[in-house]
Regions:
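Bacterial N-terminal signal peptides that target proteins for export
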Residues: 1-10
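Bacterial N-terminal signal peptides
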Residues: 10-19
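Sec/Tat signal peptide C-region and signal peptidase I cleavage site
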Residues: 20-25
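Long, low-complexity, intrinsically disordered segments
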Residues: 27-32, 278-287
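An acidic-aromatic
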Residues: 27-37, 98-159, 228-233
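Flexible, processing/modification-adjacent segments and terminal tails
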Residues: 41-59, 63, 85-87, 128-193, ...
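N-terminal mature ectodomain segment of secretory-pathway/periplasmic proteins
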Residues: 49-134, 206
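Gly/Pro-enriched, hydrophobic low-complexity segments
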Residues: 76, 111, 126-127, 175-267
């Protein structure tokens, strides 16, 4: 759910997912056993690392989103970044997202930094910076999943909600899942009853609030486990509209197309692949 800043891409931070340390406290040290003739009690049954109930909730959310032909929602991303004094400062981005499977995506983002716009129409990717009147355009692959991969690898463009808009969200998260458990229910988040689950995905600990009835993700709270600063990231998802009509001209912008061109390229091309700490970037996918 968080990434490095992308040059003109404003305060867009990459992070396919959020993580947060597990709620459980560290296990207390065992007391020295007393000598006794009584038969030792059997060891308690180990809790599975991947609880079926938690997996079922994540699968249901994935299935609900994957089945939608069109999708609209608002994503507000709160993330921390170190200040010059060393204290973590919180910044925010707001994304208005419109998607049409299998090959169209628009993201209109406002932020504490420069605003940005992203268009994908199945043939071209267009990234537009309104304040600077700059646009980067590239030929695009025929699916949203492939376009997101290209945008990240070519230009370090990443959205914190990426993992929830791909063709099969559960497949994406399950490939790197190491832990998943059910926490309970909340009646506070999103104005509805949500099921709370926690899981580790590609080195990120995530707590998710998912609608108990509609199966839609409402809140994600995450921290990279390998980040020594334990910076926190929160994604609020709201205003869901599934299978609503989308005008044909949604995924293009004449104003963006006429802006001053700039290369569709990584903002730091001198950086060698793999030099970024894992905690600061999107975990690489398995091949």
């Amino acid at each position: 759910m968080i990434r490095n800043k992308c040059l003109w891409w404003g305060l867009l931070v990459s992070a396919s997912v959020f993580l947060v340390l597990p709620n459980a406290q560290s296990k207390p040290a065992k007391k020295k056993a007393k000598t006794t003739t009584a038969e030792a009690s059997p060891a308690p049954e180990a809790t599975p690392s991947l609880e079926p109930k938690a997996l079922d909730i994540l699968k249901a959310a994935s299935s609900r989103l994957a089945a939608a032909h069109t999708m609209k929602f608002t994503a507000i991303h709160f993330y921390e970044s170190p200040s010059r004094q060393g204290h973590p400062l919180a910044f925010t981005t707001k994304s208005e997202v419109t998607l049409q499977r299998p090959d169209k995506l628009r993201v209109i983002m406002s932020a504490d930094g420069p605003a940005s716009e992203f268009y994908y129409d199945g043939k071209k990717i267009m990234a537009y910076a309104p304040a600077e009147n700059l646009v980067a355009v590239a030929d695009a692959p025929p699916t949203i999943d492939a376009a997101l991969e290209q945008a990240y690898h070519s230009a370090a463009i990443y959205f914190p909600f990426d993992d929830w808009i791909v063709a099969d969200p559960y497949k994406e998260m399950s490939e790197g899942m190491k832990l998943a458990y059910y926490i309970g229910q909340s009646k506070v988040v999103g104005g509805t009853t949500t099921d709370m689950v926690a899981y580790i995905d590609h080195g990120v600990f995530i707590q998710a609030w998912i609608g108990a009835e509609d199966k839609l993700p409402r809140l994600l709270h995450a921290t990279y486990l390998e980040d020594p600063e334990r910076l926190r990231h929160t994604l609020v998802l709201s205003d869901w509209q599934l299978d609503a009509a989308v005008p044909p001209d949604t995924f293009a912008s004449a104003k963006a197309a006429s802006a001053n061109p700039m290369p569709f390229a990584h903002p730091h091309p001198e950086a060698s692949p793999g030099t970024e700490p894992t905690a600061k970037g999107k975990p690489p996918k398995k091949q």
